């Protein structure tokens, strides 16, 4: 027997809401049944980006975006269920990550904020909603991120193999799975977030660097790369997590002030920043992995994947597709699985990863009735 969950994920790139319909058996083994994605309406994306970049939040704007994002989430769920002709009553729960608008695990007090009103989502879809996955880990002294390593361990662990699972989302994170069952994980720095922001800054008609054409037109600027790598996050020991609060267009433009560097050269150098920071992160692991498996939107960036393959050698590089999981849907599946963990009262965090004092069951629940 299995239960069906819908995992909803929207990352720091703020480009789309991904919905994964996942069958999960009694042992917690997931199987992707179907998926659907909805792009953010341009106005919603603009408002969310503005909110994430200001310290002066307006209550009405925050509340309005909370509702608007939940409505978009309900729409993607409805479209997904229509696609597969499955009724809402056949879904155990929606596991909604929400949209992160602030993540400050190192502030005093530490906090994180995800929007997407779960009550409206539950009533709008007729399905119970599990949400608020990050705050309990932070309350237990952790970073609240990354949360997917527990899922990676469940799905990707291989006996007598040391592997790394590297998510190339807005922010990159690595999960190390040792051959003896050990696990570590942490954010390594920016992946798509700076690359996408720089493309959009230079050409508002584009949302990302398709086929890395922009980056390939540029040349690596070693001095700029050196300045970028001086960001204090890279020198921090794990556990650690980051986000747009630290790696954003304002920070990048400060590094460019007084330097005449072409936009394409900047894009090429940002690509190298992602690849180098991942390479450096892997050198801190207790044991070098035999294979690095990549997932997330960054796997579609051919230049980034080329540089990672070159820099990580002799580590073998592949995507999670070779492990049976579509690299574009790993995170949405992971949150469906975290919803299953909540329903079955199983801890969803990994204290070795987040730095929490102990394992905790992640999330809270809103009933649809």
Curated annotation (Swiss-Prot):
Its EC number is 2.7.1.170. It is an enzyme of class 2 (transferase). Pathway: Amino-sugar metabolism; 1,6-anhydro-N-acetylmuramate degradation; Cell wall biogenesis; peptidoglycan recycling. It catalyses: 1,6-anhydro-N-acetyl-beta-muramate + ATP + H2O = N-acetyl-D-muramate 6-phosphate + ADP + H(+). Keywords: ATP-binding, Carbohydrate metabolism, Kinase, Nucleotide-binding, Transferase. Gene3D superfamilies: 3.30.420.40. GO terms for molecular function: ATP binding; kinase activity; phosphotransferase activity, alcohol group as acceptor. GO terms for biological process: 1,6-anhydro-N-acetyl-beta-muramic acid catabolic process; amino sugar metabolic process; peptidoglycan turnover. It comes from the Bacteria. ATP binds at residues 11-18. PANTHER family: ANHYDRO-N-ACETYLMURAMIC ACID KINASE. Catalyzes the specific phosphorylation of 1,6-anhydro-N-acetylmuramic acid (anhMurNAc) with the simultaneous cleavage of the 1,6-anhydro ring, generating MurNAc-6-P. Is required for the utilization of anhMurNAc either imported from the medium or derived from its own cell wall murein, and thus plays a role in cell wall recycling. Belongs to the anhydro-N-acetylmuramic acid kinase family. NCBIfam families: PRK09585.1-3. This is Anhydro-N-acetylmuramic acid kinase. It comes from Idiomarina loihiensis (strain ATCC BAA-735 / DSM 15497 / L2-TR).
């Amino acid at each position: 027997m299995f239960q069906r969950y819908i995992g909803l994920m929207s990352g720091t790139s703020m480009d789309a809401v991904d919905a994964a319909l996942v069958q999960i058996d009694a042992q917690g083994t997931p199987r992707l049944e179907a998926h659907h994605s909805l792009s953010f309406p341009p106005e919603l994306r603009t408002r969310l980006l503005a909110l994430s970049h200001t310290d002066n939040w307006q209550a009405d704007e925050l509340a309005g975006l909370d509702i608007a994002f939940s409505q978009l989430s309900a729409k993607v769920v409805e479209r997904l269920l229509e696609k597969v002709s499955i009724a809402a009553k056949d879904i155990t729960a929606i596991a909604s990550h929400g949209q992160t608008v602030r993540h400050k695990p190192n502030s005093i007090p530490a906090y994180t904020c995800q929007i997407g009103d779960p009550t409206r989502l539950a009533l709008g879809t007729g399905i119970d909603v599990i949400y608020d996955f990050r705050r309990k880990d932070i309350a237990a002294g952790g970073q609240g991120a990354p949360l997917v390593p527990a899922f990676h361990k469940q799905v990707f662990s291989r006996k007598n193999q040391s592997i790394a699972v590297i998510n190339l989302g807005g922010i990159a994170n690595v999960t190390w799975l040792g051959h003896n069952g050990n696990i570590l994980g942490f954010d390594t720095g920016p992946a798509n977030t700076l690359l996408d922001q720089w493309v959009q800054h230079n050409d508002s008609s584009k949302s990302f660097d398709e086929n890395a054409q922009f980056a390939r037109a540029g040349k690596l600027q070693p001095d700029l790369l050196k300045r970028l790598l001086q960001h204090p996050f890279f020198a921090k020991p794990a556990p650690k997590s980051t986000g747009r609060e630290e790696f954003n267009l304002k920070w990048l433009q400060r590094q460019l002030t007084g330097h005449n560097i072409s936009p394409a050269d900047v894009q090429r150098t940002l690509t190298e920043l992602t690849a180098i920071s991942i390479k450096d992160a892997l050198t801190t692991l207790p044991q070098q992995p035999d294979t690095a498996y990549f997932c997330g939107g960054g796997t579609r960036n051919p230049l980034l994947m080329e540089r990672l393959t070159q820099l990580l050698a002799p580590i073998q590089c592949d995507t999670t597709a070779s492990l049976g999981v579509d690299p574009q849907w790993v995170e949405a599946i992971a949150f469906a699985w975290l919803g299953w963990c909540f329903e079955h009262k199983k801890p969803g965090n990994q204290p070795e990863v987040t730095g929490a004092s102990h394992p905790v069951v992640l999330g809270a629940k809103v009933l649809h009735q």
